[in-house]
């Protein structure tokens, strides 16, 4: 887990269980796959309290503070180490009216919307990208906002917490505060 060095974020309310969130864990859970499997078994979270067989293969000298780069991208929209490390902080933008980089080759590292014109210099135009995001929010519209591609993720490692400052900044800059959050964020 590249973000295995910290635990932070809201815990899923199980009445909002979906294919995206299936278990009551925080956004940044800090677990290895083996630890997560043991937790699922131990808490009886599988249907009918089924237990899955788990074999743990220890990694010599592993600690949760060790930097780790995934050998394979976990999702077409988590295609860089930067996006993976920023994801616990930027995934919350999926519950807003902002485009969070879908429809670009930089998902979860750039965030913006057309109404932020004049408030930010950085801009991007989401387009349909087969296999990534074919109908992104604000498709073919110029969006203005934040570019986090060069953000020093070592800062996240220092604080060991989700960065909410970007959400606060973009909310304050938004001319549409009453429409900023969609109903997904309350779930």
Question: Language-model segments: which ranges?
Answer:
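Active-site-proximal beta-strand/loop segments in catalytic clefts of secreted hydrolases
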Residues: 1, 59-61, 113, 151
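Glycine-rich, charge-decorated loop segments at or immediately adjacent to ligand/cofactor-binding or catalytic sites
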Residues: 2-15
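Noncatalytic linker/hinge segments flanking ATPase motor cores
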Residues: 3, 35-43, 96-100
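Conserved anion/nucleotide-ligand pocket segment
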Residues: 17-90
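Conserved active-site and cofactor/substrate-binding residues in soluble primary-metabolism enzymes
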Residues: 31, 35, 105, 119, ...
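Extracellular structured ligand-interaction cores
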Residues: 51-54, 105-107, 145
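Glycine-rich, aromatic-lined ligand/substrate-binding cores of catalytic
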Residues: 61-142
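Conserved functional hotspot residues or short segments at active or partner-binding sites
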Residues: 112-187
């Amino acid at each position: 887990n590249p973000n295995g060095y910290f635990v932070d974020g809201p815990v899923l309310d199980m009445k909002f269980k979906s294919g995206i969130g299936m278990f009551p864990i925080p956004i940044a859970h800090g677990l290895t796959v083996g630890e997560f499997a043991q937790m699922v078994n131990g808490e009886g979270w599988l249907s009918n309290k089924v237990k899955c067989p788990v074999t743990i293969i220890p990694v010599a000298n592993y600690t949760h503070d060790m930097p780790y780069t995934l050998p394979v991208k976990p999702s077409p929209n988590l295609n860089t180490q930067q996006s993976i490390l920023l994801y616990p902080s930027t995934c919350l933008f999926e519950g807003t009216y902002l485009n969070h980089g879908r429809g670009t080759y930089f998902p979860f590292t750039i965030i913006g919307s057309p109404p932020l014109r004049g408030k930010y210099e950085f801009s991007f135009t989401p387009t349909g990208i087969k296999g990534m995001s074919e109908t992104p929010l604000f498709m073919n519209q110029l969006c203005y906002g934040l570019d986090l591609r060069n953000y020093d993720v070592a800062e996240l490692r220092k604080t060991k917490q989700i960065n909410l400052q970007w959400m606060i900044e973009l909310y304050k800059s938004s001319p549409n505060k009453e429409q900023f959050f969609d109903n997904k964020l309350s779930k």
